[in-house]
Regions:
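Aromatic- and glycine-rich beta-strand/loop motifs that create alpha-glucan
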Residues: 1-22
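Membrane-helix interface segments
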Residues: 16-17, 89-91, 193-198
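Central hydrophobic cores of alpha-helical transmembrane segments
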Residues: 22-26, 194-208, 268
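Secretory targeting signals
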Residues: 29-71, 75, 99-181, 185, ...
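Junction motif at the cytosolic side of a transmembrane helix
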Residues: 186, 190, 244-268
């Protein structure tokens, strides 16, 4: 298994892939730097929320699918998966791709959030960049902590330090992203249509978003858990509900793939 994972990781590196990974890592920070001049500023967390929210929330699962599953779907579509399965064994084949998919997505998401946090909380406050933005009204130093802790879900953790908030929130989003990416890989292996398999998580994500909004349960949406600026701060158990639901879905899908492994050549 270990050698299979190493081999698959080595196949990920190419110039186009490196460009994509760098763009992925930089996206939150670049988005924030573009938006910051047009928004009011009271504390560094305002900049961090601008970096980690925004239009990407509409297509977040599709972005995660593009990290690894899109490439993998092409291999399955060309019967590579069948050959690899027979060569290395079903368990090794599935396990290697699941691990590489999760690792790649997790590292990129976590890295992008930590970079954004470093820029928002450390770099920008020490430069003159913020003074040119609309509504630059920084709070007195003795009010920043209370403001930060009351702004959005997870920011209450800043009572133990901003670093704790940033670390826990970034890890939460990274783990959630890994679970969604795992579900995407499962859909891709099970769907007979490559396009449907790739789009399945986005479709489910969108339908869930509208259904829970219609039912008045916005706090339990996946979008709200990952991009919490749209609602008032919630207890930490609230975003764990959609995460748990996605974990169950991912486990069910992968179990179904495992049971269908002997017929893998008929999938996709």
């Amino acid at each position: 298994m270990r050698s299979a994972v190493r081999d698959e990781l080595s196949r990920l590196w190419s110039v186009p892939a490196a460009i994509f990974y760098l763009a992925f890592l930089a996206y939150p920070t670049v988005q924030g730097l573009i938006l910051i001049p047009s928004y009011a500023y009271q504390a560094p967390i305002d900049n961090f929320t601008l970096m980690t929210n925004g239009p990407v929330a509409l297509v977040f699962p599709l972005l995660l699918t593009g990290v690894y599953v899109f490439r993998f779907s092409g291999l399955v579509n060309h019967r590579y998966a069948c050959y690899a399965r027979f060569r290395s064994g079903t368990s090794t084949f599935l396990g290697a791709h699941l691990i590489v998919n999760a690792i790649t997505v997790g590292v990129l998401v976590l890295g992008s959030y930590l970079i954004a946090a470093a820029v928002a909380f450390l770099v920008l406050p020490s430069t003159g960049f913020l003074r040119g933005q609309l509504g630059y009204e920084p709070l007195p130093a003795d009010q920043v902590a209370d403001y930060t802790q009351q702004l959005i879900t997870f920011s209450q953790l800043a009572s133990a330090g901003v670093g704790v908030y940033v670390t826990v929130f970034s890890l939460f989003v990274a783990v959630f992203s890994m679970v969604i990416a795992t579900a995407s890989l499962g859909f891709t292996l099970l769907a007979r249509s490559r396009i449907l398999g790739l789009a399945a998580t986005l479709i489910l994500y969108t339908v869930e978003n509208f259904a829970l909004s219609y039912a008045g349960l916005e706090v339990f949406r996946t979008t709200t858990a990952i991009f919490p600026d749209a609602i008032t701060p919630q207890p930490l158990w609230v975003p764990m509900i959609p995460l748990a639901a996605w974990i169950v879905l991912a486990v069910v899908l992968i179990a179904r793939v495992r049971r269908s492994a002997d017929q893998l050549e008929t999938l996709a």
